[in-house]
Amino acid sequence: MTIILTDPVCPVCEFPSNVELHFGGLVCGACAAFFRRTVSLNIRYLCEKKNQCKGKRKNCRACRFDYCVKIAGMKRNLVRQRKNSTNTPMYILNRRKDSGNEEVVRGFVTSTQSKWAQHSRKSSMSPNKEAEKDVSKILKISHGRLLKYYIYQITQGKWVNMNTLNIKSVEEFLEITSIHNKLAAEICKTCPGVDLLDNEDILTIRKYFQFSNVWIESAWNYLMSADKHVQIDDSELDLTLLKFINQVKSTLLVSLSQLKFNTIEFAAFKSICIWKLVYHGTSRAMKIIAQEHYEGVAKALNDYYQTYTSMKKSRYLQF
């Protein structure tokens, strides 16, 4: 008789994993890291269903932490407090400046976002509300400046010579992607609203920036370059990689050539691709930030069409 060994199921997230003893409870490494971070940062999550969420508890951080304590038996007093502020989210540092090391309450809408919502309601009664309507209260930036942020990313020029569609070897591809990944990490630090996200969410959005830089922007630069018809020697390329590059050329590249974007339109397109948030799980806070980026860029693009072009509404709807 054949015995099939399977990984045990974590009692918190209910996923098969390597379960070990962490902080007094038998859980997976991911739930242990979540528990450590929550306790060390003194965070209390709220659940809009009063800790009665069904299904996988990873989707609700309040229920996940509740299961860490009540089901797995993890103990808060076994977690060491952080000795420095390295990798501490900005919203935690700002809260500590205002109220010391008091408990930080977070939920489906963060406390910071609640303050902004209250400020937004007060601003609606202000005589300057027309001047303020083009400013995102959450991102703390105007729609026009938000679009300019993405325009700057594609016009600063230091990525033009790092095009993955022109690579000649796997080594060159790895070198280019490594540089793009570092640039994506730098961009994330200055992206409006990212300072409001947890480290897990920041790592997720960084993946979208990386993919956008490596493939979407490469396709754009390839389309705009004068040497796109030069034959590349692909004899040294890995067959799978070559197949994927050809697929990018036959799909994304063809679509971009048909849309005929100018620089401003492509910047808006790239931002929408980054914040589409389809392929990785995201938190409620991250979805709020994504919606702010989408609405801000869309409004700025609409203003651009109405002010500087004759394309008006038809082009905006096509976009």
Swiss-Prot record:
Keywords attached to this entry: DNA-binding, Metal-binding, Nucleus, Receptor, Transcription, Transcription regulation, Zinc, Zinc-finger
Zn-finger (NR C4-type) residues: 10-31, 47-63
UniProt-listed InterPro entries: NHR-like_dom_sf (IPR035500), Nucl_hrmn_rcpt_lig-bd (IPR000536), Znf_hrmn_rcpt (IPR001628), Znf_NHR/GATA (IPR013088)
SMART domains: HOLI (SM00430), ZnF_C4 (SM00399)
Pfam families per UniProt: Hormone_recep, zf-C4
Keyword Transcription regulation assigned: yes
Domain NR LBD per the UniProt entry, residue ranges: 130-319
Cellular compartments per GO CC: nucleus
Entry keyword DNA-binding: yes
Subcellular localization(s) per the UniProt record: Nucleus
GO MF annotation: an example: zinc ion binding
Residues that span the membrane, as ranges: none
DNA-binding region of this protein: 7-81
Family in the record: Belongs to the nuclear hormone receptor family.
General function of this protein: Orphan nuclear receptor.
Name this polypeptide is given: Nuclear hormone receptor family member nhr-174
Species, as recorded: Caenorhabditis elegans
